């Protein structure tokens, strides 16, 4: 999470050596069956093209994963902020793939990495200028996944209600908070795996609350 900060304190070689150690650890956990995939969450890099202090080459990281576990490695996801007010990942060329400058989204596609959007509603600021449908369309056209902001079990309950197709409570609101699921417009097409994942998350949160 936010490897750019770690990179500030290291040389280029030191940073990628530590990345290899980390990737070896994650690949081990995948082979042990404890996790299925892993990825990286960026904070600053997508907005600064080839800025040395932040710059990280995802192609180099992908190649490290290939070195560790071959083409069947489990390095799969790249997360970054992406919304209608923050489109750097689709407009700023911050990556170099096979000698070609690309945006982060283009680079992920070229490397067969799945993209995950954080802050799809710009932490709520997007509602001051844009309609929900416009923000949904903007994000879903480019990204593979959208992260869900959820701080308590009630948020998870609301998400599951929407997934079941019961939008009466949600659709009646004039404003949506950042905790609402971006895929709400596609609630009838959500995969069972996704629903099960959030059901499990909900149960964990309920259990944690009961222990307080």
Residue ranges and their predicted role:
Residues 180-188:
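Short alpha-helical "recognition helix" segments of helix-turn-helix
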Residues 2-170, 175:
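Beta/alpha (TIM)-barrel catalytic core signal, keyed to glycine-rich beta->alpha loops juxtaposed to Asp/Glu
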Residues 191-194:
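Short coil turns linking two alpha-helices in DNA-binding domains
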Residues 197-212:
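Short, solvent-exposed alpha-helical "recognition" segments
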């Amino acid at each position: 999470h936010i490897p750019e900060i770690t990179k500030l304190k290291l040389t280029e070689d030191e940073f990628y050596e530590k990345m290899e150690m980390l990737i070896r650890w994650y690949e081990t956990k995948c082979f042990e069956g404890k996790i299925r995939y892993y990825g990286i969450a960026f904070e600053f890099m997508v907005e600064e093209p080839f800025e040395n202090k932040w710059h990280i080459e995802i192609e180099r990281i992908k190649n490290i994963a290939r070195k560790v576990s071959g083409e069947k490695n489990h390095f799969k996801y790249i997360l970054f902020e992406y919304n209608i007010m923050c489109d750097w990942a689709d407009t700023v060329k911050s990556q170099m793939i096979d000698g070609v400058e690309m945006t982060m989204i283009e680079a992920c596609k070229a490397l067969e990495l799945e993209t995950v959007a954080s802050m799809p509603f710009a932490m709520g600021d997007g509602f001051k200028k844009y309609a929900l449908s416009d923000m949904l369309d903007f994000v879903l056209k480019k990204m593979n996944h959208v992260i869900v902001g959820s701080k308590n079990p009630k948020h998870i309950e609301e998400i599951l209600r929407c997934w079941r197709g019961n939008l009466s409570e949600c659709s009646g609101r004039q404003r949506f908070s950042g905790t609402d699921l971006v895929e709400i417009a596609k609630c009838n097409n959500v995969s069972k795996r996704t629903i099960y994942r959030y059901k499990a998350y909900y149960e964990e949160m309920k259990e944690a609350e009961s222990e307080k």
